[in-house]
Regions:
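Conserved beta-strand/loop scaffold segments within soluble protein domains that form the structured core
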Residues: 1-149, 163, 170, 174-192
Length: 192
């Protein structure tokens, strides 16, 4: 009853990585937040597949994952994110949202985002999902460069900003700082 779960996931390497978190609410009043960041390079495949099962009343869940991908055409960087949220018939008062955003940095990258939401009752507070897969925004890049910021630094700033929504929600400062450092290391590969 009234349990709180904060799950943080970060993937920055590995040829094939699969992470499969599961949340199963068994008593009312639970609150779960699942946060994730990933940065895939050539030849890497990352899969995040989660299930949030709302089976009791008055629980809340929020899922937010963000990833960036850069790869070569011959050796793609690939990611797959599947977010399953189930709101069962006796889970009145549920409030849930899931989001996955992917930033494609090169032509040799592919991201699949599959949010699934199954609702068996109409008596909920809220439920929704969103997923995006998009290329780097040249308009933002142009704006920063018009302000005198060199192109490589402007790219790094935009990508850091993309991940900040997740990183700033992590309450453990040492963990959020480590993630910022790992992202900086990945960004150095881009400008190299």
């Amino acid at each position: 009853r009234d349990a709180v779960l904060r799950h943080n996931s970060a993937i920055f390497g590995g040829e094939v990585v699969r992470i499969v978190p599961r949340v199963n609410f068994t008593a009312p009043g639970g609150d779960a937040e699942l946060l994730g960041v990933y940065f895939a390079d050539s030849g890497q495949y990352f899969e995040n597949r989660m299930l949030v099962d709302h089976s009791v009343p008055n629980c809340r869940s929020n899922v937010l994952y963000k990833g960036a991908l850069q790869g070569e055409k011959k050796n793609e960087a690939r990611t797959c994110w599947v977010g399953d949220v189930l709101i069962r018939s006796n889970a009145q008062g549920t409030d849930t949202y899931e989001t996955n955003n992917n930033l494609i940095l090169t032509d040799g990258a592919r991201a699949d985002a599959i949010p699934n939401l199954e609702i068996e009752t109409g008596e909920i507070t809220g439920a929704g999902h969103a997923a995006t897969v998009g290329r780097f925004d040249d308009i933002e890049l142009f704006y920063l460069m018009s302000r005198g910021i060199p192109e490589a630094e402007a790219r790094r700033l935009i990508i850091r900003g993309f991940f900040n929504e997740v990183i700033h929600r992590i309450p453990v400062q040492s963990l959020s700082e480590e993630l910022e450092n790992r992202i900086s290391e990945e960004l150095e590969k881009i400008s190299a």
